[in-house]
Structure formats: C-alpha cells, structure tokens
Regions:
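Short periplasmic/luminal acceptor-recognition loop of GT-C membrane glycosyltransferases, typified by
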Residues: 156-157, 493-546, 555-577, 605-608
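Membrane-interface micro-motifs in multi-pass membrane enzymes
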Residues: 46-65, 159, 213-253, 277
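Signature aromatic-anchored transmembrane alpha helix within multi-pass, membrane-resident enzymes
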Residues: 212-214, 309-317, 441-478
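Hydrophobic/aromatic-rich transmembrane helices and adjacent perimembrane loops
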Residues: 55-60, 243-246, 283-284, 408, ...
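Hydrophobic, aromatic-rich transmembrane alpha-helices
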Residues: 195-205, 247, 368-394, 406, ...
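Short hydrophobic/aromatic helix or loop-helix immediately within or flanking a transmembrane segment
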Residues: 136-142, 152-179, 183
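Membrane-interfacial, low-structure loops and terminal tails that flank and connect transmembrane helices
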Residues: 1-8, 75-104, 391, 445-454
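Membrane-interface alpha helices of multi-pass inner-membrane proteins
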Residues: 264-279, 285-290, 318, 405-412
Length: 612
C-alpha cells in the first residue's frame, strides 16, 4: 500500500468515526409523531413516546456509517473489490480439510467436561420463585392440565414454549412441581451449550486455514461461545436461542453441500416450529429464510427455491394437523397482538449512544452493544466485497445471512431496552467479532511462522486451554451426591417456594374459591393460579398483555360468557414498569369495578367476587 492510499484510508476512517458520533448526537432529534390508536398502555405511552422511534434511530445509526464505509472502500480500493455478479456465481465448494474426524478428540473432551460440570451444579434453590417469569410458564401449563387447550386457554408472551416446557418437565420427571420445571431449564441450557459447540464446528470449517489452525480456531471459539450461556445467571445466550442454533447448524451446511434437499426440509420445518415455540425468534428466522429464497431466485437456484416453498407449506400443514385450526387461529390472533402492540405495552427507550454513558443505568452497555453491531457490519462488508482468498463465495454468503439475523434480532433490545434484553441481543454480533479477531491472529501467526505448529501440538494446546477454562468451574465434591441433591429439588413441595405470609394468602384464596373451577388473575403475580392449583378462567392469565381497545373487548366478553365469579384484583409481589394492570386495561378495570365486590383485602392482596 503506497503512502498516498494509506493517508486516504486514515482520512476516510476519521470521517467514519466522525459520522458515528454525528449519528449519535442526532439520535435524540429523530422522533416520530406519537399516536396510540389501539389504546395500548405501557411505559412509552405514559411519556407519549412513539415505540418506533428507536427502530428508526437504529437504522440511521447503523445504516449511514455502513453506507459511507462501502462508499469509501469503492472509492479508494475499487480494483480489490468484487462486482455484484460475483454473488450469483455457482458455489465453489472448498475441499473439506476439517471433518469431524479432525476434531473429535477435542469435541468429545468438551462434551465430557460439560457433562461433568452439569453433574457438579448446585441444585436449583428451593426458595426463590419469580412471580412474573416463572408464572409465564407454570400457569399456562396448569391451564392445559384442566382445559386440555393450548392457546385457547393461555395468551402467552413468548409462544408455545411457555406451555410446553413445564409439561415436558413434569412428564420427564413424573411429578408436577416447580423444582421439576427449574431442573428441566438447566437441562435445556446444557443442550444449548452442546449445540453451541456443534455450530462452532461448522463455522470453523470456513477460511483457507490448514487443519492444525482450524483446531485452535474451533477450541477458542467454543470456549468463547460457552461463556455466552450460564445455568443460573442472566447471560447472552438463553434457552430461546436453542431454535436459532438448530436452524443455523443446518443452514450453514447448505453453503458447502451439493445436495441440499434434506437441509431445505430441516431449515423450513425448524422455522415454522420455532414460530410456534418462540414467536420473535421464529419471525427472525423466517426473515432469514425469506431473504435466502430471494437470493435463490436471483441466482437461478430454482430447485432449492421450490423445495423450500414446498417444505414450508408441508410444515404448516403438519402444524395444523397437530394442533387443529381452532388452536392455530387463537395462536395467530396472539401473534398479531404481540407484533403490533408488545413494544407499546412492554417497551423502554433505548439509551442514546455515548451521551447516555454514566447518566442512564444501561447507557454504557447500550453504547457498547450498538457499536459492536456496527463493527460486525463493517467486518461483514470487508469480508463480502474484498477479493480475499480467505473465504469462498458460499462462506461469505453465510456470513451475510448470519449478520442479517444479528441485525434484525437486535429488535429485542430496541423494544425492551433494559440491561437484560440489551445483553441478550449482543450475542451473535459478538461472535462475528471474536471469529474475525481470532482468525486474523491465527493468520498472522501462520504468516510470520511464530510457532512451528503441527496437529499433535494443536490438540495439546486445545486440551490445555479447555482444561484451564472449564475445570475451575467444576465442583467435584458435588458430583458424588448429584442424584440426591437434584431429586431433592425436583420433588420438593411447592410450599418451600413461599413465605409464611404468602402461604396464608394462598390458603385464603383456596378456601374462598373451593367450590369454583377457576380463578381470574388480574395481577402481574402470574404464578398465583398455579399455586392454588386452579386454571385461569379466561385465556388472559397474563392480564397486563391484554392492553388495547379490541383485546379488552374480548377480555370483557370472556368474563361475561364464562360468568367468572372470582378475580384476584391486586397483589404486592410485582408490577411491570410500576404500572398497575388497572391502569393498563382501563375498560376491563371499569367493567370489573362495576360488577364485582371486595371479599378479601389482606397484606396487599385483593380478591373480588361477582355481584349477586
């Protein structure tokens, strides 16, 4: 690179940095007019803040710098870049120098240590019960037990996983307890970790690195992605990401296999079933599949395009046959409400990048994550457009679709902009950055021949690294009594999760409603119906989600039609964003106050009874 070009590049990078800060400054001035025609109430509606503001700001903040970066590399290094026709060429499949045979000792060692680590885990605490998030799962399950209905009995926030996970747990362990569900969630995290390693194996196939270097790449990336998930802490990867991992494990193989029939079947089926299980992840995956179909069409890969269309249709038919048209109709009504209203009901403002650091609680994290998103976009553009021998076309295209997923999945952070959701939305772009850094370091080591590496030394380095990272997490003394500890947790009576005051209230509610088949929960203490072992009378067990004119009408109709006798009107346990359900559902609240009277008011709990 000559001096003139180097100076130009430095100049353009400085402009790029300036654009990023300019976009950050302009962030707060991008504001759409507020309107709330559907009457949904949440933290954003209280301050008359348009829920789409942060999405538009995000598109501007990421889009403008990336457009400028693309412009300046074409301006300064056009001869080193590919043209558009390049992306529609026939795939050049790289000779596979990294089969499972190459890595099986490392893979088996990783899985072995993960299993040992799992056996050494502390059993779930028999004391803490999250009234909202645990209730999201336990109450839909109890609704199903009594009504034998899925979405017709439960309006869930995430999808079918809210219903199915406890049911599977109780079937697996043969007991209907909170502990069984909590242990099952730990098993799901273990599966998540194993799937993460499998995904990294396929990612490590990419590039022109020799096998001995790919072994190191696989090891380092595996350790990094394993650190993304935790059994007990809120972390980057969670059980919701199981479906994305399964999808990408099959999707990535579509880019280096000639016959893709079975892969097309799997990615189509996984997408549809993920929508059923976890709405937002399923929609993001469908956008990826839709983008892929468009690419197949333009690149004249008609066989794959037709297969995916057919398999999607086939998967939808299977879903209808499993659940029936009535259940699916209820489910799609829920999807519609969630898509158009969840940000209004549950949304929080995204902190202004840079300017919120040190001022807002999550300002620093929000800035870091959105900058990571931008950096991963710059890495993608460089990977896609430069005539590099490191990656083949098919490998570049996978990174493109993977980044699209990262880009749209960031919507979770833009919708609910608290620390937890921001962190959850930073996992995949972080992986792109780590892959690029490690790949670059390994390439420089190889180029400068710093280490005389061979296969045996690669294995040795990998074993040492894995041992150094994972072994300190293993509490070997816990392995001996693993069975007793976990059985104690699985079969622990639910009463152990309640304080004495809570037990008294639950007993009051049980006594008062002893002759009723159900209770209607109007609070955000969602676990109450499960604790009294009665289903919710309407499908709106999570009442705070049913905010908006049309859905409140349906709520009132269900109260009338089912002649609901008892309503738990208030609880001191939890309020989402400190907004009472009565303030969110004004029409339902008005109906309740007109038609119900107070029968119990104790320790912050209020139970209402239908007037005679």
């Amino acid at each position: 690179m000559n001096m003139s070009l180097r100076v130009k590049n430095i100049f353009h990078y400085l402009i790029l940095i300036l654009i990023v800060f300019l976009c950050s400054y302009i962030w707060k001035f991008i504001e759409l007019p507020y309107s709330n025609g559907k009457g949904s109430i949440g933290a954003l509606s209280k301050i008359k803040y348009n829920h789409l503001n942060d999405t538009v700001r995000y598109l501007f903040f990421i889009g403008l710098p990336l457009i400028y970066y693309l412009f300046f590399i074409y301006k300064t290094q056009e001869t080193k870049l590919v043209n558009i026709k390049y992306f529609f060429k026939t795939f050049e499949i790289r000779e596979d120098n990294f089969s499972f045979k190459s890595v099986w000792p490392i893979f088996i060692f990783l899985i072995f240590l993960l299993l040992i680590e799992f056996l050494s885990l502390k059993a779930p605490s028999i004391s803490y019960l999250d009234p909202l998030h645990d209730g999201d799962y336990l109450t839909p399950a109890i609704n199903y037990f009594h009504n034998k209905e899925f979405w017709e009995s439960s309006f869930t926030v995430h999808g079918g996983s809210n219903i199915f996970y406890p049911l599977i747990a109780w079937k697996l362990f043969g007991t209907q307890t909170i502990g069984a569900f909590k242990v099952f969630k730990l098993i799901l995290i273990l599966i998540l970790k194993i799937l993460s390693i499998i995904f990294i194996f396929y990612i490590s196939k990419f590039s022109n690195l020799e096998k001995k270097y790919k072994i190191i790449l696989f090891t380092l990336l595996s350790l990094i992605i394993l650190s993304f998930s935790s059994y007990y802490l809120i972390d980057y990867l969670s059980i919701r990401d199981l479906y994305a991992l399964i999808f990408f494990i099959f999707f990535i193989q579509s880019f280096f296999k000639e016959d893709r029939t079975f892969l097309n079947l799997f990615i189509s089926g996984i997408t549809i079933f993920t929508i059923i299980l976890h709405i937002d992840i399923g929609i993001y995956l469908y956008v990826i599949l839709l983008s892929y179909k468009i690419y197949l069409l333009f690149s004249k890969k008609f066989k794959d395009f037709i297969q995916i269309i057919f398999f999607l249709f086939f998967s939808v038919i299977i879903v209808f046959l499993i659940f029936g048209s009535s259940e699916i109709s209820s489910f799609f009504a829920q999807i519609k409400h969630i898509i158009f209203n969840i940000d209004k009901i549950h949304g929080l403002k995204y902190p202004q990048p840079f300017f919120s650091m040190g001022i807002e609680p999550d300002g620093s994290r929000a800035t870091k994550v959105i900058i990571f998103q931008l950096i991963s976009g710059i890495i993608l553009i460089s990977t896609l457009f430069f005539k590099s021998n490191y990656f083949k076309l098919n490998e570049k295209l996978f990174f493109l679709f993977f980044y699209i997923y990262c880009f749209i999945a960031f919507k979770n952070a833009l919708g609910r902009s608290d620390g937890f959701h921001i962190m959850e939305s930073s996992d995949w772009q972080s992986l792109i950055i780590y892959f690029s850094i490690i790949h670059l370091i390994i390439y420089l080591f190889r180029k400068n021949n710093f280490i005389n590496l061979n296969i045996k030394l690669s294995y040795l380095i990998s074993i040492v690294l894995i041992s150094a990272v994972i072994l300190p997490n293993i509490k070997f003394k816990n392995i001996i009594n693993f069975k007793n500890r976990f059985e104690k947790s699985i079969y622990a009576p639910d009463i152990g999760y309640m304080s004495d005051k809570r037990i008294n209230i639950i007993n009051y509610l049980k006594e008062e409603t002893v002759n009723e088949k159900c209770i209607q929960n109007f609070t955000e203490d969602l676990v109450i119906p499960y604790l009294i072992k009665k289903p919710n009378c309407t499908k709106y067990f999570s009442s705070w989600l049913a905010s908006g004119f049309n859905i409140e009408k349906d709520y009132i109709e269900q109260l009338k039609n089912k002649k609901v006798k008892y309503i738990l009107y208030s609880s001191p346990m939890f309020l989402v964003d400190d907004i009472k359900t009565a303030d969110r559902l004004k029409y339902v609240n008005e109906f309740i106050l007109d038609n119900y009277i107070n029968v119990i008011q104790k320790d912050g709990y209020t139970l209402l009874k239908l007037k005679d």
